[in-house]
Amino acid sequence: GIADVIPFQTPETKKKCKYLFVEADEDHIAEQHGRWSKENKGFISRLAYIYEYKQENPKVKGRKELVNTYYFSGLYEGSKGVRAFWEEVQSYIEATYDSDELQRVFISGDGAAWIDSATTYVDRSLYCVDKFHMTKYINAAANQMLDEAEEARANLYKFIYKKQRSKFKKYTEEMLASASNPEPIYELQSYALGNWNAVMRSYHNKLLTGCSAEGHVSSVLSDRLSSRPMGWSQIGADRMSKLRCYERNYGREKLIDLIRYSREQRSMKRKGTDNIAVEKVSMREIMTDQYDQS
C-alpha cells in the first residue's frame, strides 16, 4: 500500500540553517467500518510541518508565507506511534540540514501531550505554545468577569509580558472567587501555568511570530477527511493523510509517479516478476485506487 512505499528524497547537499520551525496539530476524523453506528468511533490524524522562515506573500499584502515547508502526517496511534512520528521528523532534519549549523528547532502547538513530547525525539528542540490557543483561553476566562472583562484581559496579558508567573497565578485565583462559571479560568490556569516556559518563549522570543497549524490542518487534512459528512477506515485515512502531504512536498506529477510505482510493486508481488509495463494514471484513478485499498 501507499503507506509502505512513500520514499524520502535525500538531498545531494545538506542545507545550512540556524533555526527551524515545526508546527503541529491534529484532525478529528469520523470512522466508518461497521454497519451499526455504535461500531464506528473517531480517531485522529497527526500533522506536522517544518519550515525555515516566513516572508511576505507577494500576492497577498500583509500576509506571510512559509518558506521551504515539508509535511508529515498519518494516524501514528499510541505512544509508539507518536515516537515513530517524531523520529521521522528528526530523520528528515538530519538528512536535510547541516547539524553543525543548526542551533535550534522551535516546536509550536496547542499544548497536546503528543506535540509537547517532540522535544524528547527532536534534537535541539524547544516547545512553544500556540498564541492562537492562548488567546482563546485568556478571552474565555476574562469574559467570566462580565463588566470587568476588558480589565481582566489586560491584566492577564500584563503579567505575561512582564514574566510575572506568581502574579498571574494569584490574579486568576482572585478571578475564581467572583466567576459565575469557574471552568474557563481553571482551563487557563492549567494551560498557562502548566506550560509557563513555553508561554514565555512564544511571547518574548522575536523569532517566533505565531503558529498557523490550525489553518494547515484545515487545508491539508480536513478539506478531504473531515469537513464534509463522511466516514473513513483507519487504513484509508492514514493513506490519504500521507498522500496529501506527499503532494504538498513534491507536487502532483510526483504523486502520479508514486501511485504508478505502488501499483507496480503490488503487481510484482502478485506475479512474482519484475517485467511490469508502466501505465498512465489519472488523478481520479489515484484517489479511487487508494480508497479501494482502504
Set out the residue ranges of the language-model regions.
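Catalytic center-proximal scaffold of phosphoryl-transfer enzymes
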Residues: 1-294
